[in-house]
Amino acid sequence: MATECPPKMILRKSEKLDKDASSKFLNRYIQTIERFQDEKSGSESVLSQLNRVLMYLKGEEIPLISLNLPVQGPPTEELIIPPEEMLETKEEESLKHAREENDDLHLDKETKKRLKKEKKKAARREKEEARKAKADTTQGVGEKEQS
């Protein structure tokens, strides 16, 4: 369903408006936009937002927004960690990573290159071993089927 857009309202004054003039302008705009408001919008509608601004400009008390959502507690499986503990674990992690990075800083360039190559070789060996182990298990299954 296509919704029509409200007509644009142009403010023809270049000077700053005071609260009364602003509220009058906003009130006119709200009246214009009311016809085009979709009542099925997800959260607070544009119209209700504008009405809240108008209430502020008029100096009225603004009610709290209620979304009529059911209040639910956390599921029993969920662990609730206080924010203080969260900060501590993040700091510990960042210190751990900083230590790992700083271990390589004091080494010279050649040593860093050598360590990098050794890490790559070790990773390659692990991959090859995993492939061989996988191939051995698939061959063993194939031989049993032939027997």
Curated annotation (Swiss-Prot):
GO terms for biological process: transcription by RNA polymerase I; transcription elongation by RNA polymerase I. It comes from the Eukaryota. Its main location: nucleus. Residues 87-111, 125-135 have a biased composition (Basic and acidic residues). Residues 112-124 have a biased composition (Basic residues). It holds the Pfam family RNA_polI_A14. Signal peptide: none annotated. The keyword Transcription applies. Phosphorylated. It is found in: Nucleus, Nucleolus. Component of the RNA polymerase I (Pol I) complex consisting of 14 subunits. Part of a Pol I subcomplex consisting of the subunits A14 and A43. Interacts with rpa43. This is DNA-directed RNA polymerase I subunit rpa14. It comes from Schizosaccharomyces pombe (strain 972 / ATCC 24843). The gene is ker1.
